């Protein structure tokens, strides 16, 4: 049972919210489009003294886990809807935990960044990403923070939709865990030191 009081009180700052965009169900596990969920699982696995576990939060239609980073309460959330309908659950979980739209951190796949690279930014366009379009529409702003996990562009004439819904290639597979770890590291830097410092460290790596 989720209760606001277990996460924050009047004497402490409210929780931070990290959202991982993904499609639900086993058919989509391991696909490029689901890298945001993989990053959330990595962050949950780092929780001490034991990994954080996800449970269904029916009121917001999200899978939710609670952890701490640098002594801050952090909510990890994955919408249970399909990617192009992510916005409703993201807005609902932000409202439930009293997180301002501009403080929401969204982790997602990014075709305009080379595979294996991670980039951070606040605001900007959605680059054709239907999950981001939905989130922007529901939050009413583009000025949320994005952790962009590079999956590269599709080869040849392959459609973007087909590419992101496929699993990583055999050549890429060995490096996927490093991409996930790097993106999780970037989230922790964001939470600990803020966007500008995190950008400086991540983008110079």
Locations of regions flagged by a protein language model:
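Nucleotide and nucleotide-moiety/phosphate-recognizing core
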Residues: 2-123, 132-147, 154-159, 166, ...
């Amino acid at each position: 049972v989720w209760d606001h009081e277990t996460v924050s009180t009047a004497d402490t700052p409210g929780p931070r919210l990290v959202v991982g965009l993904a499609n639900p169900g086993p058919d989509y596990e391991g696909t490029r489009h689901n890298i945001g969920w993989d990053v959330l699982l990595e962050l949950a696995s780092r929780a001490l003294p034991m990994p954080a576990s996800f449970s269904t939060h029916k009121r917001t239609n999200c899978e939710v886990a609670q952890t701490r980073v640098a002594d801050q309460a952090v909510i990890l959330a994955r919408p249970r809807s399909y990617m192009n309908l992510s916005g409703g659950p993201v807005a609902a979980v932000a409202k439930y935990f009293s997180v301002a739209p501009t403080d929401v951190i969204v982790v997602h796949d990014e075709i305009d960044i080379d595979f294996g690279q991670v980039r951070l930014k606040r605001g900007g366009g959605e680059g054709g990403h239907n999950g981001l379009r939905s989130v922007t529409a529901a939050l009413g702003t583009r000025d949320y923070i994005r952790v962009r996990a590079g999956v590269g562009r599709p080869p040849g004439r392959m459609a973007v939709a087909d590419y992101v819904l496929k699993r990583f290639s055999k050549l890429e597979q060995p490096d996927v865990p490093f991409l996930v770890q790097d993106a999780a590291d970037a989230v922790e830097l964001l939470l600990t030191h803020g966007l500008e410092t995190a950008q400086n460290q991540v983008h110079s790596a």
